[in-house]
Amino acid sequence: MTSKDIIENVEKRRTFAIISHPDAGKTTITEKVLLFGNALQKAGTVKGKKSGQHAKSDWMEMEKDRGISITTSVMQFPYKDRLVNLLDTPGHEDFSEDTYRTLTAVDSCLMVIDAAKGVEQRTIKLMEVTRLRDTPIITFMNKCDRETRDPVDLMDEVEAILNIACAPITWPIGMGKEFKGIYDLLRDEVILYSSGQGHTIQEVRIIKGLDNPELESVLPNHIHDLREELELVVGASHQFDHELFLKGQLTPVYFGTALGNFGVDHVLDGLVEWAPKPLSRAAKQRVVEPLEDVFSGFIFKIQANMDPRHRDRIAFMRVCAGKYEKGMKMHHVRTGKMVSISDAVTFMAGDRTATEEAYPGDIIGLHNHGTIQIGDTFTSGETLKFAGIPNFAPEMFRRIRLLDPLKQKQLLKGLMQLSEEGAVQVFRPLRSNDLIVGAVGVLQFEVVVQRLKSEYKVDAIYEAISVATALWVESDNPLKMAEFEKKAYDNLALDGSNNLAYIAPTMVNLNLAMERYPDIRFRKTREH
């Protein structure tokens, strides 16, 4: 019998991530979501503001310098009668692996699209990842106070490229300098735009009913076009259907401007009303329901040095079932050990607080002294392994070299920790002492060198290396595997978790190897 306490808390929670192409305004909307949830008294805007007030969710040194969110932040705040867990994901394409994994820890996503640009490359890639679990998607068309594309075209593009039906919930009145507000199709209300900058939320004027004669004087140049346009839109677009939304087949669409603090609260209203409460999770052994009395959770991310004053690493855990209580004993399934966790933390973008309890849907941080890895499962006793937390094959490679050869030990330690954290992947060729670093984008290489220097006092540089790809190898036939390991020895390497990978200098070489060894599987992803 599930306790009333767990039932009530699961009912209240909504856990979601914000996904977008870089510069679509994702970090700004994160700020404003927190502002409307009263979690921030003063929302810091991102990049180029003279006030020295940095966005609250960007907190590693390099992020402060560049104005991009490199690591995933977790923020919890109350909104109406719900408790919202928001995971801010890196928008910069170079940090996509982290983002992919974060999407395994949420129950819904808010997709932010720049209304001037429409669907962009990174959004397409992220939507592919959400498709793996049919995650429900809410869409926010941002920057309506700038010159934008036609809203009908934007929705058509989302439907055509992302293969998801669009149901408009709010509709823009004018665009750019002529942006006057939005019309809420479900409530039949016109909400007039008044810009609020930073942490000011302006009182908005709401006029009930599209036929209200008051609109003739308030919107003399727009009301006629708006009524005509809406007639067409309502006739041609999809109605909101909650079932289809929960299956990831239809997205409610909102318009607004995050920088002007306008339209964000409507999205939040939709999110807390429609997004699913914490969902069940597939483990290898069985499906885990959130309302179980027994505790379970999995690690989807490890982050080093979140607090410059403490040289520590935090493992981020999604609670899947049961209840975490301070001091409880947990079974760390991979190591087989029972551990007592008394110092778990919750986050408010860089400000961490010790937590007494956590429920399904919550994200808690465990202090990690090198024993926890991405994909690890913790339970209150049962041997479970949650499925589907992927590692993706890197696309770019460099050899890393020390400026001071005596620091080899520190270099290895630093690289291993950074690879466990998922910041980068490390491969150690069997035939040499080289260290090959693999990443999904160039910026990751910069981050690694910078963090090796600031956190491990190691000066390192990169050298070019001819590697086309690195794929994990496995086989059901031990004899064939042994033969392969012997013959392909020069091309084999161990990754940070000691899994065997094939390092292909060219794609031609890889294709030949795949033909020559049909019993060996070459894999682009590896589950943690």
Swiss-Prot record:
GO cellular component: cytosol
Localization per record: Cytoplasm
Chain's gene name: prfC
Gene Ontology molecular-function annotations: GTP binding; GTPase activity; guanosine tetraphosphate binding; translation release factor activity, codon nonspecific; translation release factor activity, codon specific
UniProt protein name: Peptide chain release factor 3
Family the entry assigns: Belongs to the TRAFAC class translation factor GTPase superfamily. Classic translation factor GTPase family. PrfC subfamily.
Organism, as annotated: Psychromonas ingrahamii (strain DSM 17664 / CCUG 51855 / 37)
Alphabetical list of SUPFAM superfamilies matching this protein: EF-G C-terminal domain-like (SSF54980), P-loop containing nucleoside triphosphate hydrolases (SSF52540), Translation proteins (SSF50447)
Keyword Metal-binding part of the UniProt annotation: no
One Pfam family named in its UniProt record: EF-G_D2
